[in-house]
Amino acid sequence: MSGIPSKTDVVVIGAGVAGLAAARRLSIAGREVCVIDASDEVGGRIRTDQVDGLLLDRGFQLYNPSYSEGISVLDLKALDVKSFTPGVVVSIDGRNYKMADPKREPTWAIDSLLAPVGKISSKLKFARYAVGLAISKSKSASYDQRTDAFLRASFGTDLTDVLLRPFLAGVFLEPELATSKRFFDIALKSFISGTPGVPSAGMQAIPRQLAAQLPSGSIHLDVTAQAVARTMVRTDLGDIRCRSVVIATNARSAALLIPSLKVPPSNAVTTWYHLADCPGSELTEGKSTLVIDGKKFRGPLDDPSRPLVNTVVMTNSAPSYASNGRTLISSSATGVHSSTQAELGVRSHLAALYKVPTGNWTHVATYPIPDALPMMAPPHDIEQSVRLSDGVYIAGDYREVSSTNGALASGRRAAEALLTDDL
């Protein structure tokens, strides 16, 4: 894309939600901002493809309307977030058991209590911990550790391996639960505070709404940043002189621009989309509820018969994701898998999870995403410095926590630091 300016106040590199949040704050403060991105659309990792009347998010993603940053910068009514059921269905030995917050899904209360996912005392202990988190004002615990170690020590092996680990593997996108307990606490608190879902127009509606708040002509796509200095950004289309720079790319791209920058590794995911040959009302009681395999971590991690960490009927809550009343299923596995054999294994696992034949389901798309989520290993600093050097700032969920809220917060903090320094 041509037409980049030769001069501006601030260059923001990256048109994901972190970069857009930074640009929004700077524009409100009266700064002239130029946002550049190497991609052909805004959104970064939050992208939605429209294919034959279907909305296909690139990887299974949800948005929680309780996110504090989103409340401040997004029009949630316009996003029309379609909430999923606040719970999970756990598949164990040929049966499906419903687990949910009894206050929000009271009809599932008995099932939640009696499901063979651990001792009742362990479930009650976990519930008390979750309630305590919900009312806590603290941002993070002073001591950090691996989530897996904390869960086993606190709630026992059965509850951890049969319920918590299968669920959290799909949240963290890593099966070992080597992720920071600080991040676990933040994620759990958000699940309690609000019910995640998807915008009716797809997840990319979020960055598109942020982009629409910027002055016309602020965003320049198909532009690759090649080098950064305080007063200049070199791109493949020419140099842009500026007073300050905000680097809001993903971690890998940021490290290419700033070789001294330490960035975390990324967790990978593969998401498959299928159209079922039955109405959504025949699957998970017509609800959009995550289905997980309670036996997935009772055997080898690479068991080909149990590839998935979760699956959900998208259209039970968000019928706009498939035209003409079709039933769209989203299913995910950690790691990168793109072979035909992998899809056949997924289809077989889906039959076991939903308890229906899946041989006639239509495979729509596969999205292998190697850099799906920054790894949050302990000890993790949830508010890392946004100042890189004089006039150069950095933003991204890997600098905060791996979530849309973390990206929004990081972008805002980078912009506010710039404004403070540029008085």
PLM features: residue spans?
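Conserved flavin/dinucleotide-binding core of flavoenzymes
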Residues: 2-3, 319-423
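Mid-domain catalytic core of redox enzymes
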Residues: 5, 226-343, 352-353
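N-terminal Rossmann-like FAD-binding beta1-loop-alpha1 element of flavoenzymes
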Residues: 5-35
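Conserved Rossmann-like nucleotide-cofactor binding loop
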Residues: 18, 41, 252
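Glycine-rich FAD pyrophosphate-binding loop
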Residues: 27-51
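N-terminal glycine-rich dinucleotide-binding loop that anchors FAD/FMN and/or NAD(P) in oxidoreductases
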Residues: 49-73
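Helical element adjacent to the flavin cofactor pocket in flavoenzyme catalytic cores
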Residues: 186-236, 240-244
